Amino acid sequence: MRRETRRTGVFTRRALITMGAQVAMLGGLGVRLWQVQVANGARYATLAEENRVSARLIAPPRGRILDRFGEVLAGSRLNWRALLIAEQTADVSGTLDTFSRIVPLADHERARIAREVQRHRRFIPVMVREFLTWDDMAAIEVNAPDLPGILVDVGTTRMYPFAEQLAHVVGYVAPPNEADVADDPGLALPGIRVGKAGIEKTHDHALRGRAGAVQLEVNALGRVIRELDRDEGVAGEEVRLTIDAGLQQSLLARLADDEAASAVVLDCRNGEVLAMASKPSFDPSLFNAGVSQAQWNDWSRDKRTPLLNRAIAGVYAPGSTIKMAVALAALESRIVSPSDTVFCPGYFDLGDARFHCWREGGHGTLDLRGGIKNSCDVYFYETARRIGIDRIAAMGHRLGLGTELAIDLPGARTGLMPTREWGNAQGHHWSLGDTVVSGIGQGYIQVTPLQLATYAARVATGRAVEPHLTRRLAGTLQPGSQPSAWPDLDLSDKALHVVREGMWAVVNEPGGTAPAAKLPDTRWQMAGKTGSAQVRRVSREQRESGTFDSSKLPWEYRPHALFVAYAPYDAPRYALSVVVEHGNAGAAAAAPIARDVMLDALQRDPGSRDDKPTAQVALRESPR
């Protein structure tokens, strides 16, 4: 009996202890539930929401680039792509292995993806593959459960309707490099492209726009259930150029037979660039996904350098096109008058050196107008000797040669108008012989085709015309395209008149050096000047043999052919330059091209037709 009572007491104590523990546990849980649901309810609700809502930035549509009449030069089309969000998979390598069995990835693609995953925060999507086909997307979706972290998305990619025809002007975009992302972390977004050349680079920030964001509901595996909210961001600004795409096509068609050439057409009145061609060219869309090493090697090995914009970065001796600058320098210095004459026997002796005229028998006695019309080398040897290199250089700069122009394109070169001071700085003792050959555009002088067109426009108008390519930015007419009087060059009307008369005679008068440039439409007359720039020295033996023919030399040893012009002669509207590399003679190779292009410009008359801004609409295209 006593033993039974003792057992009952032990049981009762154990029950009480157990019951007390249970009460304590339930009490603790109750307190915790109160803390979670009441005291900290708002905080935990937010955490729960973040666990099921994924916010992702989206790249904004890049702004369009248009010609002056609204023709699309650079636009956008849809681009379906596969992205990887590293934070949504525990095994990035395993996910990529599975993806590669569905859509094959090359080793260099895997390496790039790995670098980008390491470089960026894990919630930032990384591009796995762009330009997916319908079959690719279907296969990815079917295998979605085995592809944690993979998301099929749609963005945009750049398209260039005129491809090679405007590649050097419009430029191209490419994926941002590490330096780009370091400057702007927002460029890490998949599908973002940055301007790397041409107008795409000049106006890159305006064309980029502002990134948007999308809120997505996702499941535990990170798969999208539905879209909750979307901010499209702000599309890039629209850029309207001064270019007339129709005139550009006409110009390129005229250059089709030349291996390497360039040409520029300007509106004399405001400096608008209406056409700018550089041949050979390239397809700018190849840069969208990054150029392959094989393609880059092909371009690098091509002696014609297709990536070079010859119009702004090709430098050439101007040859006889320099003679208007020499003439104006002589007239403005009052050392030479329009009526002063020089006798040309076909050569010019300076000490022991003999400098030859292009015309073997000489031109006889010529005044300044006749010197320009006949492009007499001896006349300009003597004129250069009398005025000196510094006056020639100063006038060249004044007319836009060998100096920086305000063109809105990256990579423009300044060329060179040498002076005595420049020669001394180079360790070269400037000689009178250097000055003499400079008088016919040989020696150290270097100019670009854009400078030559600007030079022609300045001679035509007597004003400091500056070339430019941007007509409207975000719908606003740019200052350079607004009707305005460019600063006067402060050249005498008499000097300009005699030089212009000489240029008119070159084209329109019997005996001029460019009869092939005469316009067939009698409503207009063109004034111009031929030029041929040697790329190698002609020896005395070759010259004296009488059998030397530069047209029979290998292509790369032939002289460059140049021509500059403006029209109409009596009321200048358009100026141009044509440079045919190794074309041998400006009169034969460049002048006929200039004639046809100028005629087309006058007939189209783009500078007299106003443009009308158009609404921005992204061009769309289905997957391939």
Task: List the model feature ranges, each with a label.
Residues 33-55:
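Aromatic-capped interface at the extracytoplasmic side
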Residues 1-10, 23-24:
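Secretory targeting signals
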